C-alpha cells in the first residue's frame, strides 16, 4: 500500500506547510505534507502512510513535499536478508550484553537527562539541546499507534533509549538517544541491529529507518544496512548504486 488513495481511512485530509529552513541540507528550503486529523491515524492507517513515505514526530504525521528537491528517500531494511559488515558484527558482539526492556511511552527524569547529554554533544546548537521538558514530551511521547519505549541498560546503568512503532509489516524506528561518553561504543549501530532482530522475532519483514539523504552526513549511516529499499516514484525498489540517486534540486 504505497498510494494515498489505497488508504482505508478516506476521511484523512492532507495539507502542505509553508516553506521552512531544511534541517539537513544547507541553504535549502523544505516543505512537508501533513496527514490530519491525528486521532484517525491508528496503527493500521499509519502503517499504510509509512508505506507511502510518511513518518511521525509525536502526533504529527508528515512526509517531505519540497518544491525543488527530492533528496529525501524513505528507506527500509529487508531484515531476513540483512548482511552484516565486519564493523556491524563487532558492534553486535560488543553490546549484546545490554539488557533491553520494552515499556509503553512514559516520562522518566533519567531518560530526559540522557536525552539532554546526547543532544548537547551530538546536535549542539540545533535547538533540541535546550532544557525543555515540555519540548521533550511533545517530541517523543504522544502516539496514537502501537509504540514502545525501549531501555538499554548495562549493569543497571541506562545507556540508550529508543522509541519504536510496531506496524503490520515492520518496525518503524522513531528516535534513539544514547550515552555519548562511552569510549569506542557504537550504540546507534547496535540499536538498528537490535530492531532488525526484533522484526525477525515478530516475523515482520521490514525495518523502516525514515529518510536517507545522499548528501547529508547525518543520514549516511542508514546506507550501511543492506539490503536497503527506497521508495522512488511510488514504488519500493532496492537501493544499489548510491551515486545514481538525486542530490537535491531538480532542473
Curated annotation (Swiss-Prot):
Q: Which GO terms describe its cellular component?
A: cytoplasm
Q: Which reaction does it catalyse?
A: N-terminal L-glutamyl-[protein] + L-leucyl-tRNA(Leu) = N-terminal L-leucyl-L-glutamyl-[protein] + tRNA(Leu) + H(+); N-terminal L-aspartyl-[protein] + L-leucyl-tRNA(Leu) = N-terminal L-leucyl-L-aspartyl-[protein] + tRNA(Leu) + H(+)
The EC code for this enzyme is 2.3.2.29
What Pfam families does the entry give? ATE_C, ATE_N
Q: Where in the cell is it found?
A: Cytoplasm
**Intrachain disulfide bonds:** none
Q: Does the keyword Protein biosynthesis apply?
A: no
Output the superkingdom of the source species. Answer: Bacteria
Q: Which principal EC class is assigned to this enzyme?
A: transferase
Q: Name one GO molecular function term.
A: leucyl-tRNA--protein transferase activity
Q: What is its main location?
A: cytoplasm
Q: Set out the biological process GO terms recorded for this chain's protein.
A: ubiquitin-dependent protein catabolic process via the N-end rule pathway
InterPro entries per record: Acyl_CoA_acyltransferase (IPR016181), Asp_Glu_LeuTrfase (IPR017138), N-end_Aminoacyl_Trfase (IPR030700), N-end_Aminoacyl_Trfase_C (IPR007472), N-end_Aminoacyl_Trfase_N (IPR007471)
Alphabetic keyword roster: Acyltransferase, Cytoplasm, Transferase
Family matches, as NCBIfam families = PRK01305.1-1, PRK01305.1-3, PRK01305.2-3
Q: What does this protein do?
A: Functions in the N-end rule pathway of protein degradation where it conjugates Leu from its aminoacyl-tRNA to the N-termini of proteins containing an N-terminal aspartate or glutamate.
Family, as annotated = Belongs to the R-transferase family. Bpt subfamily.
User: What's the protein called, per UniProt?
Assistant: Aspartate/glutamate leucyltransferase
The encoding gene is bpt
Amino acid at each position: 500500500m504505497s498510494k494515498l488513495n489505497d488508504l482505508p481511512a478516506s476521511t484523512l485530509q492532507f495539507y502542505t506547510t509553508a516553506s521552512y529552513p531544511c534541517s539537513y541540507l544547507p541553504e535549502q528550503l523544505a516543505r512537508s505534507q501533513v496527514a490530519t486529523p491525528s486521532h484517525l491515524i491508528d496503527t493500521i492507517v499509519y502503517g499504510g502512510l509509512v508505506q507511502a513515505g510518511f513518518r511521525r514526530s509525536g502526533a504529527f504525521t508528515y512526509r517531505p513535499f519540497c518544491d525543488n528537491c527530492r533528496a529525501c528517500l524513505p528507506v527500509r531494511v529487508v531484515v531476513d536478508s540483512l548482511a552484516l559488515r565486519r564493523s556491524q558484527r563487532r558492534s553486535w558482539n560488543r553490546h549484546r550484553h545490554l539488557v533491553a526492556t520494552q515499556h509503553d511511552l512514559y516520562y522518566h527524569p533519567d531518560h530526559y537527562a540522557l536525552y539532554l547529554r546526547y543532544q548537547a554533544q551530538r546536535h549542539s546548537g540545533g535547538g533540541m539541546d535546550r532544557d525543555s521538558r515540555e519540548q521533550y514530551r511533545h517530541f517523543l511521547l504522544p502516539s496514537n499507534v502501537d509504540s514502545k519505549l525501549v531501555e538499554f541498560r548495562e549493569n543497571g546503568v541506562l545507556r540508550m533509549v529508543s522509541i519504536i512503532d510496531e506496524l503490520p509489516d515492520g518496525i518503524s524506528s522513531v528516535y534513539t538517544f544514547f550515552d555519548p561518553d562511552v569510549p569506542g561504543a557504537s550504540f546507534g549501530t547496535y540499536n538498528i541491529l537490535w530492531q532488525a532482530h526484533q522484526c525477525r522475532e515478530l516475523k515482520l519483514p521490514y525495518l523502516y529507518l525514515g529518510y536517507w539523504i545522499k548528501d547529508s552526513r547525518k543520514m549516511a549511516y542508514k546506507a550501511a544496512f543492506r539490503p536497503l529499499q527506497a521508495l522512488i516514484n511510488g514504488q519500493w525498489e532496492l537501493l544499489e548504486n548510491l551515486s545514481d540517486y538525486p542530490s537535491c534540486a531538480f532542473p
